[in-house]
């Protein structure tokens, strides 16, 4: 994990509160920025930080496995090499999402890209896109997509 800040003793209570506030604000911005594009390159974090390395590892595992509809959190845990509770704590802390939400949101973001490309090319239907990104039930895909983006896949294609 690592330290985000340190204070020398004796410390001023106001200084402690200011540091905590800054850390929480930075974490919130980090989560918000990551949740928008799910890209670690856009994050303003030291390249050698443990958080950036962890997110890069998590992203590479999901990128390698997202098409597999059987890829679940248990597989994610095994590939990342940490316990379920630690994985969920780190994912929640860094991205504001559980490991399962992270996988699903990655798939949904890819599906959105495919739908937008498909709007022009018209080479795939919604079910094919759902299968392409690792969903094995197009109806479940549509429910998740609609909940995540507040628009149905079909209406995204029509606009």
Named regions from a protein language model:
Residues 7-9:
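A Lys-centered signature of the CheY-like receiver
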Residues 93-136, 158-159:
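Terminal helix-turn-helix DNA-binding modules in bacterial transcription factors
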Residues 59-71, 91, 95, 113-124, ...:
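Basic, amphipathic alpha-helical hairpins
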Residues 21-37:
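The C-terminal output helix
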Residues 73-103, 130-152:
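Basic/polar phosphate-binding segments, predominantly the helix-turn-helix DNA-binding elements
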């Amino acid at each position: 994990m690592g330290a985000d800040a340190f204070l020398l003793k004796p410390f001023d209570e106001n200084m402690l509160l200011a540091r905590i506030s800054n850390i929480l604000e930075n974490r919130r911005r980090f989560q918000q920025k990551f949740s928008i594009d799910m890209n670690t390159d856009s994050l303003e974090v030291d390249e050698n930080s443990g958080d950036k390395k962890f997110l890069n590892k998590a992203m590479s595992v999901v990128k390698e496995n997202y098409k597999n509809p059987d890829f679940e959190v248990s597989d994610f845990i095994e590939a990342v090499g940490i316990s379920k509770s630690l994985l969920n704590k780190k994912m929640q802390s860094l991205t504001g999402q559980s490991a399962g939400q992270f996988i699903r949101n990655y798939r949904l973001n890819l599906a959105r890209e495919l739908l937008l490309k498909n709007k022009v090319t018209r080479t795939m239907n919604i079910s094919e896109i759902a299968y392409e990104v690792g969903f094995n039930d197009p109806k479940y895909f549509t429910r998740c997509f609609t909940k995540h983006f507040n628009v149905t896949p079909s209406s995204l294609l029509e606009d």
